[in-house]
A protein has these predicted regions:
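Short, exposed beta-strand/loop patches in secreted or surface proteins that constitute
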Residues: 24-25, 42-47, 86-91, 144
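ATP-binding glycine-rich loop module of kinase domains
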Residues: 28-74
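Conserved structural core of kinase catalytic domains
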Residues: 54-56, 76-121
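Catalytic activation segment of kinase domains across protein kinase-like and atypical kinase folds
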Residues: 134-163
Length: 163
């Protein structure tokens, strides 16, 4: 299936939670229905007249740290060819942070502190840049870190929930 790229991208939100790796996609505050599911590793979503391919790997644990990815505001014209890779940063985040560096499933929510976050953030930046994904902004609980601008926010939530 061809992945079409919308001219304007705003508020796309991936939310991962639970042992089953449940995935949801939100666009402008509305949940977008998944179109198909292939081999447990690929989803296609419709946003307006566009089809968006989202690939992900996730082994989250309910009640512990959950991963969220937001794509905010805009994508620079020169980065549009990386749009599907930007969406696939969910792969990158879970590959990099999850959970080879830290045994998140052994952490209590109160243990998700800034020291752990700092290493987490460095790894996310490294992985996203490896895949030529730019403008990364990482949010961890109440701490916000900005890297080269702002369309991508990666947020470690607590308890598998997000606001």
């Amino acid at each position: 299936m061809t992945t079409l790229i919308p001219e304007v991208v705003s508020g796309i939100h991936f939310h991962y939670m639970g042992k089953t790796g449940t995935v949801g996609l939100w666009y402008k505050g509305l949940q977008v229905p998944r179109l198909s599911f292939v081999d447990g590793s690929r989803q296609f979503f419709r946003v307006g007249s566009y089809f968006i391919k989202a690939e992900y790997v996730f082994e989250g644990y309910s009640g512990q740290c959950a991963n969220e990815i937001y794509i905010q505001n805009r994508i620079r014209p020169q980065d549009k060819k990386y749009f599907t890779k930007l969406l696939a940063c969910s792969d990158i985040v879970s590959e990099g942070i999850q959970w080879t560096m830290f045994p998140w499933y052994n952490l209590r929510p109160t243990s998700c502190d800034s020291k752990i976050f700092a290493v987490c953030y460095k790894q996310v930046i490294s992985l996203c840049e490896r895949y030529q994904i730019y403008d990364v902004e990482y949010a961890f609980n109440t701490n916000w870190y900005i890297h080269n601008g702002r369309p991508l926010i990666v947020d470690c939530g607590i308890g598998g929930q997000s606001e």
